[in-house]
A protein has these predicted regions:
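Core segments of cupin and vicinal oxygen chelate
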Residues: 14-69, 106, 113, 129-131
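Amide-forming acyltransferase catalytic core, primarily the GNAT-like/NAT-type
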Residues: 60, 80-81
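Generic beta-structure capping elements
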Residues: 64, 76-78, 151
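A short, acidic/glycine-rich surface segment
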Residues: 42-47, 81-86, 125-127
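Vicinal oxygen chelate
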Residues: 1-4, 13, 35-36, 73, ...
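Eukaryotic phosphotyrosine signaling hubs
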Residues: 8-10, 92-96
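Short, low-complexity disordered segments enriched in Ser/Pro/Gly and basic
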Residues: 5, 53-55, 90-91
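Short, structured motif recognition centered on aromatic/hydrophobic residues
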Residues: 70-73, 94
């Protein structure tokens, strides 16, 4: 049941350097910028975010595999910034974003070479339906957790 008539729109990542992080997702995952770049500030933003003096810049990136009207990854850089906690996969709230890739080990190496960090080891699990998923957690250059996964029968 969808009593709100809702549909998925976007996931937001708050970045330290939004341009660099957007370039990472464009280059390594095929995300595509959706113009225009965002630049918001003023009383409405402060009221909406509850952050006094809030200002943000950033962009929306179309996620791969969903066509020209699919959901986006919204990457914003806020002023003033608030430093975060170290990345972990089991903290309540945003856990990770997952991308299906052809080759998990190669994708892992590419992410690490681009400034990401390892979180866990590559593993293959068999699901209840008998499918196999090979996956690993890494971080992007700013510490956001990414799951790289590949499926087989």
């Amino acid at each position: 049941m969808n009593t709100l008539n809702a549909r998925y729109g976007h996931t937001n990542l708050v970045a330290r350097d939004w341009r660099s992080l957007a370039a990472f997702y464009e280059q390594h995952f095929g995300c595509v910028p959706v113009p225009p770049e965002r630049d918001y500030r003023g009383p409405d933003l402060e009221a909406g975010t509850g952050v006094p003096g809030a200002a943000l810049q950033g962009a929306h990136l179309r996620l791969p595999g969903h066509g020209p009207n699919g959901p986006t990854l919204e990457i914003y850089q806020y002023q003033p910034p608030l430093e975060g906690l170290p990345p972990v996969v089991n903290r309540p709230g945003f856990g990770h974003i997952a991308f299906v890739v052809d080759d998990v080990p190669s994708a892992r190496e590419a992410v690490l070479a681009a400034g990401g960090r390892p979180v866990g080891e590559i593993v293959t699990l068999t699901t209840a339906t008998g499918s196999k998923v090979t996956w690993v957690y890494v971080t992007d250059p700013e510490g956001n957790v990414i799951e790289l996964q590949s499926w087989s029968k």
